[in-house]
């Protein structure tokens, strides 16, 4: 077939060259955005008198027909037409005649594709924000049910201090809240229109960029036409934000994987989110958590890939920019899927409160309580730290724990020890007393839950 841009050429490309250069296999995902952008563009052309109202109406009817066909997956795309833009224009001309060729007046594929991607990401980021909020509501629900569930808190994956399981869960709530904030802030840069920037220098036609931007729901326009068609920082920002979100999901999944093991037994995954072994009948594998952890690297790769594509590109458009889409599409699909799986996995998991409680009674995670006890009685903390270190050494040599040490032994270490010491050694009391702002104390957790509910109330309402 003859190309819509073929006037300059005397030879046709080989079929394999066409296939190599075509992007329709993946950019057809922009079909709805491409048609909606074209409807806004031709509406603006008619308003400005660049095309007649009759021509615009005919073009819009043709585009609306194609949009309905697209929604029903009835459009058939061809590699010969290269990309989504030329495929739609070709179909439009076939449907309404040569007047369809006027659609591209005052526009280039360069600003057209940028517009499509802005529209696409605006919609998808809003979906991801909503899905993240839904995951946060699951975290709130689990935290409410586990305020007084005591577990070890860890540093270096070694038991450190007793904490509330709700406190641990809410740590991820606040990480996700920052992810939501980053996505929301990015919408300010996504929600601007490149349409009308042309190939790179604008156009000689008296277009109204603000009007077409308004029709598409954008908050403004790019101020520089070169910038509008050549940068993909809005996609990079999306990929970066998604990488951080996936990092948070991956860290949580790593803990869920550990906690579901026989060595921990803190939780059990629902059968819906686990698989078995083809050879070992006893196995229950946390495959969904492992997949989320694994897919995090995939999202990182999409970010690094586009950064590498962009780093050496001169202004303005270069064909390299065709490589901006597949990673974006893949990241959207990956993030949406991971958020959905994560919410279901956390909602259906069983928490083994007894095992968590046992883990903080047969260890030394209450050692800091003794140091604080001595410091509260006026002993410098560093001296208190040394005394408790000797006590822990004594216990490990005797094969006992701090609760097993008789008061006489404590008094040999320091005369400041009294009978009330054993109260502070209780893991429950240790957690309860940590009532500083943002701490693991039960009252602080209740305060944090109220704030968290306030941030997710719209999701709960819907």
Curated annotation (Swiss-Prot):
GO terms for molecular function: argininosuccinate lyase activity. Disulfide bonds: none annotated. Pathway: Amino-acid biosynthesis; L-arginine biosynthesis; L-arginine from L-ornithine and carbamoyl phosphate: step 3/3. It is found in: Cytoplasm. Gene3D superfamilies: Fumarase/aspartase (C-terminal domain), Fumarase/aspartase (Central domain), Fumarase/aspartase (N-terminal domain). One of its GO terms (cellular component) is cytosol. PROSITE patterns: FUMARATE_LYASES. This is Argininosuccinate lyase. It comes from Bacillus cereus (strain G9842). The gene is argH.
